Curated annotation (Swiss-Prot):
This is T-box protein 37. Residues 19-195 bind DNA. It comes from Caenorhabditis elegans. Transmembrane segments: none annotated. Keywords: DNA-binding, Nucleus, Transcription, Transcription regulation. One of its GO terms (biological process) is positive regulation of DNA-templated transcription.
């Protein structure tokens, strides 16, 4: 229930099983459309039995447990009818990318950044799609690097681990009062409820758990424009070196500037007021070129310590 061992000897267990034990089997997870909601208790795993020197990549996805849609009635969850059509699987790679077995086993493998949403149009890489009033179980995948090809086999889905205690029902509002109290007690960032059990105002609960509060428009407008542009998102350039999901369509290798066009224009306008103009596209192209040179010089098969879009992880 709290741990699982594969035939090859790889063992996966929950880092804090005592917390999951208090929630199971009535665990509920809030889902929101815009910003998503962090999964709590967090999906933190301990991994043992890996080859210390081999490279591995770890993924996670949410799997529907059954074809049933549920309802909360008389203090318990009951079958409400046939479930909605099952959605395609979304594999989410751990932001640390490829690491040796020693590195993965040295500390918990945490997916605390992962949020669930019910908006199929939301493309945020930290969000994973789930359907309300359906039961899910997180599935952990561990993929080993092919030592002969120097890359992952595209048809190899790795070893899968399902821990029964992590099952949960997706809801838009907590149904179980006792579970609500547990959430507030164990999670100081619990959104939607104050510590006294009362609901927060909509303006208070809009931010998801662990998310920083929004800044006011007046505060943002008063900021002085930065001297340089924010760093480019290089994760869109090369699907091999940048921890891309191997189950998704490879991204273009050409630099993309659309995400920064508005900022570049603003900064150019700011520079014009001071009698200067700067070609931001040329700046990005040069930065992208030298970044590519640095990556290629590192050699294939070496862990790439690059920006993966998830700070502090």
């Amino acid at each position: 229930m709290y741990s699982c061992t594969s035939p090859s000897g790889i063992e996966v267990s929950l880092n804090k099983p005592e917390i999951w034990e208090k929630f199971y089997p009535k665990t509920e997870m809030i889902v929101t459309r815009k910003r998503g909601r962090v999964i709590f208790p967090h999906l933190d795993y301990n991994v043992k039995g890996l080859d210390p020197d081999s490279l591995y990549s770890i993924y996670i996805h949410l799997e529907r447990v059954d074809g049933i849609k549920y309802k909360f009635d008389a203090g318990e969850w009951k079958e409400a009818g046939k479930g909605d059509p099952i959605l395609p699987i979304q594999y989410k790679e751990h932001p640390r990318g490829k690491r040796t077995g020693t590195e993965w086993m040295s500390e918990p493998v945490s997916f605390a950044h992962l949020k669930i949403t019910n908006d199929p149009e939301n493309k945020d890489q930290k969000l994973i799609l789930a359907q309300s009033l359906h039961k899910y179980i997180p599935v952990l995948h561990i993929k080993q690097l092919d030592p002969y090809k120097g890359t992952f086999q595209m048809d190899f889905h790795g070893v899968e681990f399902r821990l029964e205690a992590t099952q949960f029902i997706v809801v838009t509002a907590y149904q179980n009062e006792e579970l609500t109290k547990l959430k507030v007690h164990h999670n100081k960032f619990a959104s939607g409820f104050r510590s006294n059990g009362k609901r927060r105002l909509s303006s208070e609960s809009e931010n998801s758990e662990n998310s920083p509060p929004k800044r006011s428009a007046s505060a943002i407008s008063s900021l002085t424009p930065p001297a340089i542009s924010p760093p480019m998102d290089y994760t869109q350039q090369n699907p091999y070196f940048f921890n891309q999901n191997f189950f998704s369509t490879p991204q273009s290798h050409q630099p993309q500037f659309a995400a920064h066009s508005a900022n570049a224009q603003n900064y150019n306008n700011f520079g014009a007021q001071n009698g200067a103009q700067f070609d931001w596209n040329v700046y990005y192209q040069r930065q992208w070129y030298w970044q590519q040179q640095m990556m290629m010089s590192g050699g294939i098969g070496q862990p790439q310590m690059l920006n993966n879009g998830f700070p502090n992880l």
